[in-house]
């Protein structure tokens, strides 16, 4: 039995859409964002969270990684830069430039 890789870093992306786009963007983000991240070598896990707020819909994608090097293979040298999906400009109220990065303690 092999041990699963230990999570050392999490990468958190946050985006907002109009409330009317909640379901449509959920499907799009899951299919073209979450599923893509799941297939990236080195990725341990990825989860999508969503919530309807008073005046918008909010989404978070949290990906779990064993090392900065594993993230870099996916994101490039600056591991905090956002990698937008092709249709994000059609949905998102603003295009975030960076993700949050946390070391798991």
Locate each region found by the language model.
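Short, well-ordered beta-strand segments in beta-rich or mixed alpha/beta enzyme
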Residues: 9-16, 45-77
């Amino acid at each position: 039995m092999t041990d699963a890789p230990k999570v050392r870093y999490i990468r958190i992306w946050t985006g907002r859409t109009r409330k009317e786009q909640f379901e449509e963007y959920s499907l799009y983000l899951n299919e073209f964002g979450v599923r893509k991240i799941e297939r990236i070598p080195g990725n341990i896990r990825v989860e999508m969270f969503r919530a309807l707020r008073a005046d918008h819909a909010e989404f978070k994608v949290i990906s779990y990684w064993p090392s900065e090097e594993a993230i870099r293979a996916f994101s490039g040298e600056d591991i905090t830069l956002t990698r937008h999906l092709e249709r994000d400009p059609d949905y998102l109220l603003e295009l975030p430039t960076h993700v949050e990065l946390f070391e798991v303690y």
